Amino acid sequence: MNTVRVAFLLVFVLAVSLGQADKDENRMEMQEKTEQGKSYLDFAENLLLQKLEELEAKLLEEDSEESRNSRQKRCIGEGVPCDENDPRCCSGLVCLKPTLHGIWYKSYYCYKKRSA
């Protein structure tokens, strides 16, 4: 019976000592993995930042192309409100106060010139 106790005690001591070593080893492995995870996160963050900067540059480039190609309107069409002091009606149109149905509005509109 003593040999069984000694054998059991010996197995117990070995299990505890090896288990403790495994615990320390596991702790070190976890620290390494978290450090690697942080480096992966930093890498992913930098990659995402680069992609966002490229996208922003493309969007700004498209905006500048649109503004370069778009043409500002120089005249106002028929039936469109205009300013009495600064008429910008297109050729063949005159800025006049509306008659009849347009008297309710306090604005001038571009109308065709009347040939008299």
Swiss-Prot record:
Location(s) in or outside the cell: Secreted
Region feature (Disordered): 61-83
Keywords in alphabetical order: Disulfide bond, Ion channel impairing toxin, Knottin, Secreted, Signal, Toxin
Cysteines engaged in disulfide bonds, as pairs: C75-C90, C82-C95, C89-C110
Tissue: Expressed by the venom gland.
GO cellular component, one term: extracellular region
GO MF annotation list: sodium channel inhibitor activity; toxin activity
Propeptide residue range(s): 22-74
Signal peptide positions on this chain: 1-21
Described purpose of this protein according to its UniProt entry: Probable ion channel inhibitor.
Family as reported in the entry's similarity comment: Belongs to the neurotoxin 14 (magi-1) family. 01 (HNTX-16) subfamily.
Domain remark from Swiss-Prot or TrEMBL: The presence of a 'disulfide through disulfide knot' structurally defines this protein as a knottin.
Protein name: U11-theraphotoxin-Hhn1b
Lineage: Eukaryota, Metazoa, Ecdysozoa, Arthropoda, Chelicerata
